[in-house]
């Protein structure tokens, strides 16, 4: 009997010690790979445990470059998790977009490294006996070229909605997507990183108070596209239970690179690694320093307007491929066949997707426009817009027929609408349609409010690409510079997103009712005054549907 009493007292001491750690300023979390020491912060009076720079893979360097991620090495003792890890190597404009999307009170300058497969966890402090909390995993956007976990502070969302917020980062650009189309470099390294992070969450999130059986993926732009793509991948099946795509889906035509070997050879030529043997080519690229890889990336001029080049030869960005591992077929094909994860899906767009940020990054001119110059611009970007040379006159007629050639304001507006509809809006509505037809719950939105407090862009009369992010992460509270109505909108959106994470339905409490997307095509217009809309951009979407069906 004495040994039973001794064992009981020991177990009680262990539980009390672990419990106490969660309620100290230096909380501990016991993962499968070792113990982490985080820090405790307060959002108002609510304590949040924060763990930063948590490894979910071995560093993807040396022989691990252009290879699938492997689980991290276990460590002895207690690992410090109170500072951000470096972010993945990326284009120089990543600093600008990080400043643009930053949800911290103060901007965090980025530090770059190829050793970058880390995530951050923001978790509410649980009272004894509390159930495990829903988990929300954020996929940053950035045209597959930029993006970082340290840009996003999940503490406001975690505190106000009692969810565990995980923010991941993955390899980018050449390092994240290079593919030779064969076994030497199948590609999709970034998506394999994402899947590795999801597997880490399944194995370890209980140590932070998260429920591995209630995981929601949410992301923006290219991050949203990856989420949409992973919904068609058997590798990701069972690793999440709901999905949210903000301004991006795998229906976007450029999500899949059709001829990856052609792109790889162009990169290899610029790097001095060109060879008929893909093994020698890849081995050569592995010998480059990170700085050399980024110099090659700059020479590729990703996501920049190529006005003098045949658009068929332009590589807009590195992106996923059909590799037979992550994707057995193009996700568009799988979506049309209803081969998609059986989970609820919330998705939407902003009403001014191509207003300032994307033209600024692309160096797309938005002044001194004439219809003649617009025609040339559209031809230069035709592969991005998914239109042929023969279709361009039809597109010009649809969007510019009633606009005077000297009315700069209207020309600019219609060009912005054209680009947004061709890239984000039409593909989002198609994705909503496919998921609805597959028989799973769908909720559609259009966000319409300008994001306050962003220092690097001019004020607009609507929501630019990414403007919704701050409202979902509670920036009106953490950063200030917001009206009471904007704070109310942020509270509303955090509640919608968290309700969806909890139940698969954004509705609940006193929130304005959000109807499910069905054959009536109802959606929610998110603004200071929230209302239900029907058939988003009906006339223009009918035009794009006719154009792509002919």
From Swiss-Prot:
<dbReference type="Pfam" id="PF00135">
    <property type="entry name" value="COesterase"/>
</dbReference>
<feature type="disulfide bond">
    <location>
        <begin position="88"/>
        <end position="116"/>
    </location>
</feature>
<feature type="glycosylation site" description="N-linked (GlcNAc...) asparagine">
    <location>
        <position position="386"/>
    </location>
</feature>
<dbReference type="InterPro" id="IPR051093">
    <property type="entry name" value="Neuroligin/BSAL"/>
</dbReference>
<feature type="disulfide bond">
    <location>
        <begin position="273"/>
        <end position="284"/>
    </location>
</feature>
<keyword id="KW-0964">Secreted</keyword>
<dbReference type="InterPro" id="IPR029058">
    <property type="entry name" value="AB_hydrolase_fold"/>
</dbReference>
<dbReference type="InterPro" id="IPR019826">
    <property type="entry name" value="Carboxylesterase_B_AS"/>
</dbReference>
<keyword id="KW-1015">Disulfide bond</keyword>
<dbReference type="GO" id="GO:0052689">
    <property type="term" value="F:carboxylic ester hydrolase activity"/>
</dbReference>
<feature type="signal peptide">
    <location>
        <begin position="1"/>
        <end position="20"/>
    </location>
</feature>
<comment type="function">
    <text>Probable carboxylesterase.</text>
</comment>
<dbReference type="InterPro" id="IPR002018">
    <property type="entry name" value="CarbesteraseB"/>
</dbReference>
<feature type="active site" description="Acyl-ester intermediate">
    <location>
        <position position="221"/>
    </location>
</feature>
<keyword id="KW-0325">Glycoprotein</keyword>
<feature type="active site" description="Charge relay system">
    <location>
        <position position="465"/>
    </location>
</feature>
<feature type="active site" description="Charge relay system">
    <location>
        <position position="353"/>
    </location>
</feature>
<dbReference type="GO" id="GO:0005576">
    <property type="term" value="C:extracellular region"/>
</dbReference>
<keyword id="KW-0719">Serine esterase</keyword>
<keyword id="KW-0732">Signal</keyword>
<keyword id="KW-0378">Hydrolase</keyword>
<feature type="glycosylation site" description="N-linked (GlcNAc...) asparagine">
    <location>
        <position position="276"/>
    </location>
</feature>
<comment type="similarity">
    <text>Belongs to the type-B carboxylesterase/lipase family.</text>
</comment>
<protein>
    <recommendedName>
        <fullName>Carboxylesterase 4A</fullName>
        <ecNumber>3.1.1.-</ecNumber>
    </recommendedName>
</protein>
């Amino acid at each position: 009997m004495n040994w039973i009493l001794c064992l009981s007292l020991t177990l009680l001491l262990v539980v009390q010690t672990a419990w106490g750690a969660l309620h100290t300023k230096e909380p501990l979390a016991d993962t499968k790979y070792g113990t982490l020491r985080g820090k405790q912060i307060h959002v108002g009076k609510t304590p949040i445990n924060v763990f930063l720079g948590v490894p979910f893979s071995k560093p993807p360097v040396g022989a691990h470059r252009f290879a699938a991620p492997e689980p991290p090495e276990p460590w002895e003792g207690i690992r410090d998790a109170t500072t951000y890890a470096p972010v993945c190597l990326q284009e120089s404009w990543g600093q600008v977009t990080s400043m643009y999307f930053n949800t911290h009170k103060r901007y965090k300058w980025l530090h770059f490294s190829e050793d970058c497969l880390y995530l951050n966890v923001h978790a509410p402090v649980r009272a004894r006996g509390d159930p495990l909390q829903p988990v929300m995993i954020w996929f940053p956007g950035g045209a597959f070229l930029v993006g970082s976990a340290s840009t996003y502070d999940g503490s406001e969302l975690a505190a106000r909605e009692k969810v565990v917020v995980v923010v991941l980062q993955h390899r980018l650009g050449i390092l994240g997507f290079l593919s030779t189309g064969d076994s030497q470099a199948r590609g999709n390294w970034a998506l394999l990183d994402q899947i590795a992070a999801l597997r880490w969450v399944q194995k370890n999130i209980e140590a932070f108070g998260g429920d591995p059986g209630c995981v929601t993926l949410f992301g923006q732009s290219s991050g949203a596209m990856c989420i949409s793509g992973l919904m068609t991948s058997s590798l990701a099946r069972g690793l999440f239970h709901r999905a949210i795509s903000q301004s991006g889906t795998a229906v976007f035509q450029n999500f899949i690179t059709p001829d990856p070997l052609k792109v790889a050879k162009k990169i290899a030529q610029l790097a001095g690694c060109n060879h008929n043997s893909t093994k020698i080519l890849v081995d050569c690229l592995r010998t480059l320093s990170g700085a050399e890889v980024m110099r090659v990336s700059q020479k590729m001029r990703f996501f920049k307007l190529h006005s003098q080049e045949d658009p068929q030869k332009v590589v807009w960005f590195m992106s996923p491929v059909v590799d037979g591992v992550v994707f057995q077929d193009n996700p568009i094909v799988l979506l049309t066949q209803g081969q998609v994860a059986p989970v609820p899906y919330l998705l939407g767009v902003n009403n001014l997707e191509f207003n300032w940020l994307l033209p600024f990054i692309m160096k797309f001119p938005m002044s001194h426009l004439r219809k003649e110059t617009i025609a040339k611009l559209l031809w230069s970007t035709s592969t991005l817009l998914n239109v042929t040379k023969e279709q361009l006159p039809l597109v010009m007629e649809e969007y510019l027929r009633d606009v005077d050639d000297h009315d700069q304001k209207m020309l600019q507006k219609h060009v912005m609408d054209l680009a947004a509809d061709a890239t984000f809006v039409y593909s989002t509505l198609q994705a909503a349609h496919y998921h609805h037809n597959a028989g799973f719950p769908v909720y559609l939105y259009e966000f319409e409010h300008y994001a306050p407090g962003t220092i690097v862009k001019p004020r607009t009369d609507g929501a630019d690409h990414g403007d919704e992010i701050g409202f979902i992460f509670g920036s009106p509270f953490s950063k200030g510079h917001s009206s009471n109505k904007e704070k109310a909108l942020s509270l509303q959106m955090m509640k919608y997103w968290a309700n969806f994470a909890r139940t698969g339905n954004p509705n609940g409490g006193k929130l304005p009712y959000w109807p499910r997307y069905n054959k009536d095509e109802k959606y929610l217009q998110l603004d200071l005054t929230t209302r239900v809309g029907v058939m988003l951009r009906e006339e223009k979407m009918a035009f794009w549907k006719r154009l792509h069906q002919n």
